[in-house]
Amino acid sequence: MVIKAQSPAGFAEEYIIESIWNNRFPPGTILPAERELSELIGVTRTTLREVLQRLARDGWLTIQHGKPTKVNNFWETSGLNILETLARLDHDSVPQLIDNLLAVRTNIATIFVRTAIRNHPEKAQEILAQAQTVDDNAESFTALDYGIFRGLAFASGNPIYGLILNGLKGLYTRVGRYYFSNPEARKLALTFYSRLSTLCDEKAYDQVLDCLRAYGKESGAIWHSMQGTMPSDLAEARR
């Protein structure tokens, strides 16, 4: 395995995660004893202990006092925070993972965007107005797009939607930087934000669903046209 982490803790974390992913430490099995594992990885037991606690919080492991550390089935025990890790571990699956990410965003947005526009129209308009001053580059549009969806999620009155968007931020941002490098993607997004603003003004709440689905379909078509030239390091973390 190729591990790029620079710190001992980062190295140990990547080593264990990749070992779980590659079934060196299969789900359901017991992790090697602390002394053995620290020697195997080449880190101190103190560093290893900190890493194991962090991996347990992320759902990779189960640690119980007086019992061996168990490897979890991370699909069942982890949260959205491991999306970037999964994308980095399996480059071949990145397009499908991103398709799933975008589908989730569209599906939940049909609920929270409509609710935000209906129940808190002034706040929704304030959020959408950010699109009027955005710089025409990928970085700015990525921040804008995430900010609008996240802002409307919280404006819906149900903070759980906002927390879901928080969990998607890492991979969402990496994808956005590439997707919004396409001028057509930026143009489509501005049209979408403007349309939402109009629907908010007109109190046309029943049209929000169709607007979101149309945007999901059109932005998905642009995204699929870009997959052939997608950089191999799209999911790599900045270390």
From Swiss-Prot:
One of its GO terms (molecular function) is fatty-acyl-CoA binding. It is found in: Cytoplasm. Residues 34-53 bind DNA. GO terms for cellular component: cytoplasm. The keyword Iron-sulfur does not apply. Pfam families: FadR_C, GntR. NCBIfam families: fadR_gamma, PRK04984.1. Homodimer. This is Fatty acid metabolism regulator protein. It comes from Yersinia enterocolitica serotype O:8 / biotype 1B (strain NCTC 13174 / 8081).
